[in-house]
Every structure is written in C-alpha cells, then in structure tokens.
C-alpha cells in the first residue's frame, strides 16, 4: 500500500533535495495520524527539534517545492493516477483482507464467530424439525445451510451431530440409526438423497437376498454343507492322528537302527580269507566303513530309498560268483491324505498314477544296471554279502538310467572282476553290450589308477615326517 522506493523523484527535482528535509518511508507513504509527520527525536527529520516537516518552510532554506497541508499533494505531479491510492485507502481497511477472495462461501474464514448466533440456530432447528425422520443433511443441504447461517460446513456438521446425540439421549429418536457417521456417508455418497436403510422396499429386497443366500448355503444342489463341514473337521482330526503315528514310526525305526548298530559289529570280511581274496582287496583299495558312518547313513534318508519307496525292484543275479549287496526296502503302503474332500475323492487315482510311474521307473532302472555295485569306498568286497542291508545303499547316480549309458561306470566294479577259478567260465559273458576284452582293459586301467592313488597316499603320508626332520636339522 506504500509508494515504490527509488522511483519517486525525477533527476531535475533531485537537485532540490539538498535543501529539503530527509523523508522517511512513513512520511512518503502518507500519515495515518497527525503524529506520523512529526519526528520522534526532532533532529532526524527536521533541522529544529519538535518542528513539523510539512506545515511550513523552515527559515534559511529556500526550496522550489511548495508544501501544502496535504502531504500526498506534493507527489501528485510525479506519480500517475494508477498509483494514487489516496481515495481507496479508507475503503480498503473496512473489509477483512482474507475473506474477499472466497466470495459468499466462507470456508475457513477467521472473521466468523466461533459459536452460532440465535438466527443460525433457529434456522438449523427448523430444518431439523422438518426432517425428523431423516436428520442427515446431504452435502448440498449442508452448503445451503452454511450460506444461510453464515457458518462453515464443519460447524453445520458438528451442530447436526450434537443435535442427534442430544435427541438420542432424550429418547426422542424418530429415525433409524446409521452404522457409520454422517461425514463418511457424505464423503462417499454425495448425491445420495435417501439411504437404503430408510427405504422399506430396499430393506425387504435385501432381506430376501439374505434369505436366498442362506437357503443356498443350506442346500446348494441338494448337498448339505453342515454335513460336509463335519466331515472336514473329522478329516483334520484323522490327519493329525496320522501325522502323530508317522512320527512315532520314524522314532521307532531310528531307535531300532541305533540299537542294531550299538553292539560291536563283526568284521565285514571273515578272518579266514584266502590270499587271493586279500590280494583283490588290496587291489581295489577297499576301506571298510566305521560305525559312525553306518549311523550317519542310517539317520539320513538316501536318494536310492527315495527312488525305491513306492516299488520294489526285482534284482536278479548278474554273475555266478557275485551277488548284489543292494536290496531295496519293502514298498511302503500309501496312505490317502485327508487334507480336503477333493483330496479324498481323487486319492485313489493319485495312488494308481504314482504306482504306475514307480513301476516304469523301476523297470528302466533294472534295465540300466540298477544291480551294479557301489563305489569302492562304499561297498564291501566280493566275498562279503549283506542280503538284508539297507544302510550300505548306493548313491543315486549309480542307479539312474542315463549314467551307465554315458560312462558305463557300473561295469568297472570289483563285483564283475570274476575272481577265483570261476572267472574262466564267464569269459565270454556280455554285460550291458560290452565285450569281455573291453571289460578286461577297463579293469586294468582302473587298477592302474588305484595303484597310482595308493602310491600318492603313501607319499603324502611320508611328507610330514620328512618336513619335520628337515626343520629339526635346520
């Protein structure tokens, strides 16, 4: 509302400022009272203390500007008409500066009073008496009442909420209460004049729909849901008992294995071995497993057990003097899962599919050297047989069909080396499509590799002693 700084005087008039008293911003902007033109200290604005700057020219100062009683009249020649606010200053102070842009909708106007007047309260009471059956004004009605009563929307909503609460305490309710507050209803349903709860026809329709839904729940296509729910609960209880029984069986099985392995185990090979058998044992570099390894394999499920869980593969004798030490465990009886009614209905089909898949896997495994022996570090010698042993089971890759097809690893075992005098009987035996010369050559290579590995082991055993000896000499 003040004049802009720095653009008040032209250069021709600036020469006369040396003889004029200094002007402050309060003097330039126009005094509101008579005291604004007077200097507070006297010496800052006029050469004499207590003198006024614009009432008369001071003695000893000649100024080309003629001062009058109106302070703003001296600047009329230099300031254009758009900047002349002398006529509008008085009117600008009459209204609140923040209420004008909002117009007639006084949203958040600080000029409005906090409490409602008597006229506003009378208007709101009249509307409430007319709508006693549904005292929930819509958004449009609230805006209209706020305009009439010169209140805000928040004040109108609060007044109606308090009025409904007061009538409810006085037991003067003539309407059906709502589950949600009217503010949420107004925000979500702005154009909703009538609520569904107030319309009896819609209430009847909703009741019919609820009744139909209940009938459908009782008998959909003639099936009783209560009976099915009871079966589901029974199935869950049976499932829990089945899980407990399986856990008990696992514990008993582990305890039986630990008890069977707790007494001192007899030597894997009989002491009265022939020199030929001992030489073969030295050739294949076999080391027997300890009790800890037996326990380790007994406690952990083996991959071969997982393959042969649902079926038992019939292993036939491969050679005359060698028998497979691997015998699959008996097939476990498949129990139907009671997770749901659909699982019960389809459990028989799943059992059939599972058994068929297991039979196919078993036949393919039998065709591709399932009965081949394990690695030298995991299998006993050819003279030691454990027909009922499930602990010394082979790794999974010895029984997978594709592995012998690539490497024929199973034919390199010591079980097919034909020890003793009966080796000449089976000299022309063909195993897995490989001739006997090929087998002999492969066995020779395997023996050479084992001799090399044994010599390396001996060297490795001797090196620590030599190192210690060399260090002591140093």
Curated annotation (Swiss-Prot):
Cellular component annotations (GO), alphabetically ordered: cytoplasm; nucleus
Compositionally biased residues, Pro residues: 263-273
InterPro entries attached to this UniProt entry: HD (IPR001356), Homeobox_CS (IPR017970), Homeodomain-like_sf (IPR009057), Iroquois_homeo (IPR003893), KN_HD (IPR008422)
CDD domains: homeodomain
Claim: Metal-binding is one of the keywords in the record: no
Induction or repression: By hoxb4 and hoxb5. Down-regulated by hoxb9.
Gene3D superfamilies the record matches: Homeodomain-like
Chief location bin: nucleus
Protein keywords: Developmental protein, Differentiation, DNA-binding, Homeobox, Neurogenesis, Nucleus, Transcription, Transcription regulation
PROSITE patterns the UniProt entry points to: HOMEOBOX_1, HOMEOBOX_2
Tissue expression from the record: Early in gastrulation, expressed in cells beneath the blastopore lip. Subsequently expressed in the neural plate in overlapping patterns with other irx members, which all share an anterior border of expression. At the time of neural tube closure (stage 19) in regions of the midbrain, hindbrain, neural tube and optic vesicle, where expression continues during tailbud stages. In stage 34, expressed throughout the eye retina. Does not appear to be expressed in the developing heart or pronephros.
DNA-binding region: 109-171
Subcellular location: Nucleus
Region ranges (Disordered): 174-222, 252-294, 453-474
GO molecular function annotation: DNA-binding transcription factor activity, RNA polymerase II-specific; RNA polymerase II cis-regulatory region sequence-specific DNA binding
Keyword check for Transcription: yes
One of the protein's GO biological processes: regulation of transcription by RNA polymerase II
SMART domains linked to this entry: HOX (SM00389), IRO (SM00548)
Pfam family, one: Homeobox_KN
Family of the protein in this entry: Belongs to the TALE/IRO homeobox family.
Function description: Acts partially redundantly with other irx members in neural patterning. Required for formation of the posterior forebrain, midbrain, hindbrain, and to a lesser extent, spinal cord. Patterns the neuroectoderm in both the anterior/posterior and dorsal/ventral axes. Does not appear to play a role in pronephros kidney development. Involved in craniofacial and gonadal development. Modulates the migration of progenitor cell populations in branchial arches and gonads by repressing CXCL12.
Protein's name according to its UniProt entry: Iroquois-class homeodomain protein irx-5
Name of the encoding gene: irx5
């Amino acid at each position: 509302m003040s004049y802009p700084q720095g653009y008040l005087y032209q250069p021709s008039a600036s020469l006369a400022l040396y003889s004029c008293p200094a002007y402050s911003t309060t003097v330039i902007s126009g005094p509101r009272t008579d005291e604004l033109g007077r200097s507070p200290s006297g010496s800052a604005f006029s050469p004499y203390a207590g003198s006024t700057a614009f009432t008369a020219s001071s003695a000893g100062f000649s100024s080309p500007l003629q001062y009058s009683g109106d302070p703003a009249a001296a600047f009329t020649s230099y300031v254009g008409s758009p900047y002349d606010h002398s006529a509008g200053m008085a009117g600008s102070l009459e209204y609140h500066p923040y209420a004008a842009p909002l117009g007639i909708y006084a949203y958040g106007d600080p000029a409005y009073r906090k409490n409602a007047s008597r006229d506003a309260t009378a208007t709101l009471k009249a509307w409430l008496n007319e709508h006693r059956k549904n005292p929930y004004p819509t958004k449009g009605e609230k805006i209209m009442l706020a305009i009439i009563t010169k209140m805000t929307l928040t004040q109108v909503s609060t007044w109606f909420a308090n009025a409904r609460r007061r009538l409810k305490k006085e037991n003067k309710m003539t309407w059906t209460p709502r589950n949600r507050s009217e503010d949420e209803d107004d925000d979500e349903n702005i154009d909703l004049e009538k609520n569904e709860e107030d319309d009896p026809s819609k209430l009847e329709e909703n009741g019919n729909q609820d009744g139909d839904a209940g009938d459908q729940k009782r008998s959909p296509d003639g099936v009783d849901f209560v009976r099915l729910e009871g079966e589901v609960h029974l199935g869950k209880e049976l499932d829990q008992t089945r899980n407990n029984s399986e856990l008990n069986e696992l514990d008993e099985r582990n305890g039986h294995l630990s008890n069977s392995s707790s007494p001192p185990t007899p030597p894997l090979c009989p002491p009265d071995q022939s020199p030929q058998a001992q030489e073969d044992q030295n050739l294949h570099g076999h080391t027997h497993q300890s009790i800890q390894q037996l326990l380790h394999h007994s406690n952990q499920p083996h991959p071969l057990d997982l393959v042969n869980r649902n079926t038992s593969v019939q292993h036939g004798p491969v050679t005359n003097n060698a028998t497979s030490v691997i015998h699959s465990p008996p097939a476990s009886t498949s129990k139907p899962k009671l997770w749901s009614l659909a699982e019960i209905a389809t459990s028989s089909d799943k059992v059939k599919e599972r058994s068929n898949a297991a039979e196919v896997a078993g036949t393919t495994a039998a065709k591709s050297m399932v009965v081949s022996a394990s690695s030298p570090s995991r299998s006993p010698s050819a003279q030691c047989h454990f027909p009922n042993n499930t602990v010394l089971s082979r790794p999974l890759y010895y029984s997978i069909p594709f592995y012998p097809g690539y490497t024929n690893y199973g034919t390199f075992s010591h079980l097919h080396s034909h020890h003793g005098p009966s080796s000449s009987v089976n000299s022309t035996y063909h195993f897995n499509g490989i001739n006997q010369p090929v087998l002999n050559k492969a066995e020779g290579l395997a023996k050479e590799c084992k001799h090399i590995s044994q010599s390396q082991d001996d060297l490795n055993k001797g090196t620590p002693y030599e190192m210690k000896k060399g260090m002591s000499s140093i």
